Amino acid sequence: MEPKRVAEGKTKIVYEFDPEHYLLRFKDSITAGDGARKDELPGKGTLNAQTSALFFRLLEKNDIRTHYVGMYDEKTMIVTKLKMIPVEVVLRNIATGSIVKRLPIKEGEVFDPPIVEFFLKDDLRHDPLLNYSHLQYFNLLTRKEAEIVEEVIVKVNAVMKNFLKERGLVLYDLKLEFGKDKDNNLIVGDEITLDSMRVRDEKTNKILDKDLYRKGESLEVVKKAYEDFFNLISR
C-alpha cells in the first residue's frame, strides 16, 4: 500500500512516513521555463535522489543542518518534516543565466564575494526577485532570518566549491530552499542536484547540468551528463 501523498511538484512527490518524517520521492521528469517545457528522462529520479543524498551527507559532515535522514529506496529519501518557505535562495559565483539578462553583467564575470539573491517561488510570475523588505512584507523571512540564510548558503557554497574543485569541476551557482523544523530552526531542505546548480568542467568548460536541457540538447545528452557527474562525485 502506497503511503499517503501530501504534495506533488514538478520533479518530486512528498508522502507521509511517520509523525516526524516525510518520504521525498524523485520523479523522472525534467522541466524548464517554469514548467512550460517538460519531458520524462528514465533514471533521472534515481540519479537526482542519489546526488542529493550525497550532497546532504557532505553538508551534515560540515556541521550544516539539512532535512536529510536517510534513503528509503534508490529514488526516495526519508526527510525531517519542515514548514517550507516558498523562497529560492540563489548564490552566484560566476555570471550566467538570468542575472546577465536582468543586469549589465557579462557572461562569465566572477563574483568575489558571491552574490546572493532571493526569489519568490511563483511559476505564474516567473519567480520574481525579492529584497529584505519584500521578505518581511510577505511574512516569509525576517531580516535576521534572511541574514542567517545568507550565512548558511555562503558556507554551503564554500564546502561544495571545494568538493567539486577537487574533482575538476567549477560551481557557477546553486539554489537552496529552506524550511523550519518544530523548534523553528532554519534547515536546508528540498534537494541539491543538477536541477538546482550550474556546474562546468574546469578544463573544457563543458556544461554538466540542466542548462543542457534548457539549451535544447537531446535527452540522451542530458542523461549522460547527469550520469557522468554522479560518477565523478561518487569517487
Curated annotation (Swiss-Prot):
It catalyses: 5-amino-1-(5-phospho-D-ribosyl)imidazole-4-carboxylate + L-aspartate + ATP = (2S)-2-[5-amino-1-(5-phospho-beta-D-ribosyl)imidazole-4-carboxamido]succinate + ADP + phosphate + 2 H(+). GO terms for biological process: 'de novo' IMP biosynthetic process; cobalamin biosynthetic process. InterPro entries: SAICAR_synt/ADE2_N, SAICAR_synt_PurC, SAICAR_synth, SAICAR_synthetase, SAICAR_synthetase_CS. Its EC number is 6.3.2.6. SUPFAM superfamilies: SAICAR synthase-like. It holds the Pfam family SAICAR_synt. Belongs to the SAICAR synthetase family. This is Phosphoribosylaminoimidazole-succinocarboxamide synthase. It comes from Sulfolobus acidocaldarius (strain ATCC 33909 / DSM 639 / JCM 8929 / NBRC 15157 / NCIMB 11770). The lineage of its organism: Archaea, Thermoproteota, Thermoprotei, Sulfolobales, Sulfolobaceae.
